[in-house]
From Swiss-Prot:
GO terms for cellular component: host cell cytoplasm; host cell nucleus. Residues 12-75 form the J domain. The lineage of its organism: Viruses, Monodnaviria, Shotokuvirae, Cossaviricota, Papovaviricetes. GO terms for molecular function: zinc ion binding. This is Small t antigen. InterPro entries: DnaJ_domain (IPR001623), J_dom_sf (IPR036869), Papo_T_antigen (IPR003354), Papo_T_antigensf (IPR036092). The modification N-acetylmethionine is found at M1. It comes from Simian virus 12 (strain wt100) (SV-12).
Amino acid sequence: MDKVLNREESMELMDLLGLERAAWGNLPLMRKAYLRKCKEFHPDKGGDEDKMKRMNTLYKKMEQDVKVAHQPDFGAWHSSEVGSDFPPCPDTLYCKDWPLCATKPSAHCPCMLCQLRNKHVYRKFLRRDPLVWIDCYCFDCFRQWFGLDLNEEALLWWSHIIGETPFRDLKL
């Protein structure tokens, strides 16, 4: 919503609608105010024609850009565009074989725990300095950062955080 109009335009639209700027993004409220102000600014009803034109321009621009952002295929992806690196089962997505994957990660294992641990080893070799949590999302960095033992509860917390982390941030 913040990218629909620039700051000056959004402030001007809110002023024309007679709404507080904190209401920006409340589309039903903005729509009601727009319809009310259309009656007030309409030249045939003795209103200000310039304000009416400007309000229409800004409102239509905002409305159009919001519709584009909310179309079903906006930013969508198709399965054909994404590789099948991970098995479909969510139980094996994060850790395929506990505790083997946590103690001896395999380069051939598709689970996130092994993939991130192997990436950790590679990046540590390139950088020659220690990696820390958020710089590296592997299970070992997570446990070290939070002082957790090697157990399934720590794995559960790690997998929950990894599940909420955007894939691009994992640097895989």
